[in-house]
Amino acid sequence: MKRLCIIPCGKKKIWDVQPDAGPVRAEDAYLSPFHQACERYAKTFFDEWVILSAKHGFLRPDDLVSGNYDVTFGTGHPEIMTADELRRQFHEKGFSDIEELVMLGGKKYRSVLNAVIGEHQHISWPLSSYKGIGYMLQALNRAVEEKHEL
């Protein structure tokens, strides 16, 4: 069965440390420790993974991100992609055919993804039982180190 891992983007980006970096691949754009741990996990256990950005939607690792931004789901920011835009992009990128989705993120992503996925799709949230980002980071790092999927 084909699976897709969805990881959150993160606030700290390459342009925060290299303002003149210009456009970069999505997998190189996000620098927060949590995003980095999620990316390592996704690369370890999944053939296909994407980054979910409130501004850009579903980014494949090779998709280009043009520059810095600060847009977060649930904030009412005018640049947040709508559910319709996310649904269209999800379908156009071929993700609506994937039955098993895994989201490495917290509660704020539930309503976003529930509005996007199809009825035939199952989404799991392996970090939902961890209370706080520190525990999530520990779990992700331990899983990669021990080669044991959450």
From Swiss-Prot:
What domain of life?
Bacteria
Question: Which InterPro entries does the entry link to?
Answer: DUF6884
The molecule here is called: Uncharacterized protein YfjM
**The species this protein was found in:** Bacillus subtilis (strain 168)
Which taxonomic lineage is given here?
Bacteria, Bacillati, Bacillota, Bacilli, Bacillales
